Regions:
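A membrane-topology feature that recognizes alpha-helical transmembrane segments
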Residues: 1-211
Length: 211
């Protein structure tokens, strides 16, 4: 019962954090000269998803691992911001991802040598850079943006080895299925598509289930 009550309370914190994420995203969009949307999923989605995820992580970790819960909640909030901003604007912001990468690099020192997290993040980023360049060369169109490359590097810093492999696999599979669905729906396999949300979902799944 204690864990349930704590999870409910932390879910409320997540709802508030999600609202702040949306508020900040609107401000950042305007700095990028982008017009934010105000559809229900855009306005309420971050709060709902953050509340759900914060509650799940709180129930799993409990009060015995409070510092770890706070840290993971911050990373989850970054992924939530990426999901909704990239879906809305097809953009992953340097103003969000670079500070998050710095925090993840420091946090990676917690349970591994200083170079391990950096090496994993760099490797993940380079893999996606290669996929981006190769895909663009073969298809004559941008397949993965540099935002996806930076997101992959952030995931590597957060998850470390070997969990980054699982997260990228989940993200790529989810993204491929969604891309085919969007292509069929729009009757064009060259439709604009955001891969970042699916990479972020893969990272969240691994962070919760295996890490």
């Amino acid at each position: 019962m204690t864990n349930v009550l704590f999870a409910v309370g932390w879910a409320a914190v997540g709802a508030a954090a999600g609202w702040l994420s949306r508020w900040g995203s609107v401000k950042l969009a305007r700095l990028e000269e982008l017009e934010p949307g105000f559809k229900p999923w855009q306005v309420y989605g971050p709060s709902v998803l953050a509340a759900l995820l914060f509650g799940l992580f709180a129930y799993d970790l409990g009060t015995a691992h409070l510092l770890l819960l706070v840290l993971r909640s911050v990373f989850v909030l970054v992924f939530v911001q990426v999901i909704f901003f990239d879906l809305e604007h097809r953009l992953i912001l340097d103003r969000v991802i670079f500070p998050a990468m710095a925090l993840a690099a420091v946090a990676s020192l917690w349970n591994q040598p200083w170079w391990a997290g950096i090496a994993t993040g760099l490797a993940a980023g380079l893999i996606f850079l290669f996929l981006s360049v190769a895909g663009s060369a073969m298809l004559k169109a941008e397949v993965l943006g540099f935002g996806d490359v930076k997101l992959a590097a952030f995931m590597g810093l957060v998850l470390g080895w070997p969990w980054i492999v699982t997260a990228l696999f989940y993200g790529v599979v989810l993204g491929a299925v969604a891309a085919v669905g969007v292509g069929i729906w729009k009757r064009s396999m060259h439709a604009t598509f955001a891969y970042g949300p699916y990479l972020a979902l893969g990272a969240i799944a691994v962070l919760y289930a295996f890490h």
